[in-house]
Design a protein with these regions (language model features):
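Generic detector of well-ordered alpha-helical packing
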Residues: 38, 101-102
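Conserved P-loop
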Residues: 2-90
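Glycine-rich phosphate-binding loops of nucleotide-dependent enzymes
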Residues: 98
């Protein structure tokens, strides 16, 4: 099976959720999935994915706080995560590799766009790659085979409703 490059971007809710949906569908078909989550710590999906640990591996490279100005620690975690994702893409172990919030990590300057473009150009033909996060760079969009932009039409956050465990995290 050929592997393609997908991007889920935009200011709307559902980018990670869409990628996790692909992971679940892939696992249901017996495919092996690696998920690298940038700028995040463990959330509710980790508990659910433990049930599929023979098919889905998930790692996080972040801290609980929202990042406005990246620290050296943030950059080091992002670099570690990028290496882990790169190794997973090239390992021959995984059919699908998800780099969750990679677009934001690039936007914040934690990772280099050129390194990402080189990685995608050299990816094995049979590995599906999914990139998520706001601010997808033009270079990634041009290289991708499928790009979906999530657009917020209405969101309860604007009414003061906070993120809820099990729904948003």
């Amino acid at each position: 099976m050929d592997g393609y490059i997908q991007i889920y971007t935009g200011n709307g809710k559902g980018k990670t959720t869409a990628a996790l949906g692909v992971a679940l569908r892939a696992a249901g078909a017996g495919l092996k999935v690696f998920i690298g989550q940038f700028l995040k710590t463990q959330s509710s999906e980790h508990q659910a994915l433990k049930r599929f640990e023979d098919l889905i591996k998930i790692e996080t490279y972040g801290r609980p706080e929202f990042i406005k100005t990246p620290s050296v620690e943030d950059k080091n975690m992002a670099k570690k995560g990028f290496k882990s994702c790169m190794d997973s893409i090239n390992s021959g172990k995984y059919d699908v590799v998800i780099l969750d919030e990679i677009n934001v990590a690039i936007h914040l300057g934690l990772l280099n766009l050129e390194q990402m473009l080189v990685l995608l150009k050299k990816k094995p033909k049979d590995v599906e790659i999914i990139l998520t996060g706001r601010y997808a760079p033009k270079g990634l969009i041009e290289m991708a085979d499928l790009v979906t932009e999530m657009h917020e039409v209405k969101h309860y956050y604007h009414k003061g409703i906070k993120a809820r465990k099990g729904i948003e995290f």
